[in-house]
C-alpha cells in the first residue's frame, strides 16, 4: 500500500507508483513524500551531513509487524528538471526514483551489492516500460 504526502504543487493520480509498490511490497505500507528542492537539501544536510539537494532518499523503518516499510522522499523539482533533460515524462522519472528508493527500503544497496539492485531495477523497468534506470544513468556519467 502506498501513502502519499505531496508537499509540492505536483498533481498526479500516482497510479503507476501504486502498481510498483504492490509489486515490490504488496503486504507493506510505503510512504512517499514529494518535497521541494530546499526541503530535500535540509533533509540531506540534517540527516546525512551532505549540504546539497539530491533526487531521492530512502528511510527504512524497523521490521515491526503492521508498521510501514519506510519512507521514500523524492525531490519533485529535480525530478522535473531531469525528466526534461532526459526527454521523458515526469511520471516516468518519479517512477524510476520510487523504484530505486523502495529497493533500498527492501535492503538492496547498489554501492555494496554485486549488481543485484541494478538487475532488479532492470526487471522492473522492463515490466513497467520505463526509460533508463537511475543506477545506469549514474554509471554513464
Curated annotation (Swiss-Prot):
Entry GO CC: cytoplasm
Annotated GO MF terms: metalloendopeptidase activity; RNA endonuclease activity; zinc ion binding
InterPro entries in the record: MetalPrtase_cat_dom_sf_prd, YbeY, YbeY_CS
Compartment(s): Cytoplasm
Disulphide bonds in the chain: none
Domain of life, source organism: Bacteria
UniProt keywords, alphabetically: Cytoplasm, Endonuclease, Hydrolase, Metal-binding, Nuclease, Ribosome biogenesis, rRNA processing, Zinc
Gene3D superfamilies, A to Z: Metalloproteases ('zincins'), catalytic domain (3.40.390.30)
Record text on cofactor binding: Binds 1 zinc ion.
Cofactor names: Zn(2+)
Record-listed Zn(2+) binding positions: 100, 104, 110
Main location: cytoplasm
One Pfam family named in its UniProt record: YbeY
GO biological process: rRNA processing
EC number: 3.1.-.-
Family: Belongs to the endoribonuclease YbeY family.
Function field: Single strand-specific metallo-endoribonuclease involved in late-stage 70S ribosome quality control and in maturation of the 3' terminus of the 16S rRNA.
Xref: PANTHER family: ENDORIBONUCLEASE YBEY, CHLOROPLASTIC
Official protein name in the record: Endoribonuclease YbeY
Phylogenetic lineage: Bacteria, Pseudomonadati, Campylobacterota, Epsilonproteobacteria, Campylobacterales
Amino acid at each position: 500500500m502506498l501513502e502519499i504526502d505531496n508537499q509540492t504543487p505536483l498533481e498526479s493520480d500516482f497510479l503507476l507508483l501504486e502498481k510498483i509498490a504492490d509489486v515490490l511490497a504488496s503486504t507493506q505500507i510505503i510512504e512517499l513524500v514529494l518535497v521541494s528542492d530546499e526541503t530535500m537539501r535540509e533533509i540531506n544536510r540534517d540527516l546525512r551531513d551532505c549540504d546539497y539537494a539530491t533526487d531521492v532518499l530512502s528511510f527504512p523503518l524497523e521490521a515491526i509487524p503492521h508498521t510501514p516499510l519506510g519512507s521514500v522522499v523524492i525531490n519533485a523539482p529535480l525530478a522535473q528538471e531531469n525528466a526534461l533533460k532526459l526527454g521523458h515524462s515526469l511520471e516516468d522519472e518519479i517512477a524510476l526514483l520510487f523504484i530505486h528508493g523502495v529497493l533500498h527500503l527492501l535492503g538492496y544497496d547498489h554501492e555494496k551489492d554485486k549488481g543485484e539492485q541494478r538487475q532488479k531495477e532492470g526487471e522492473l523497468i522492463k515490466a513497467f516500460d520505463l526509460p533508463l534506470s537511475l543506477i545506469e544513468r549514474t554509471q554513464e556519467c
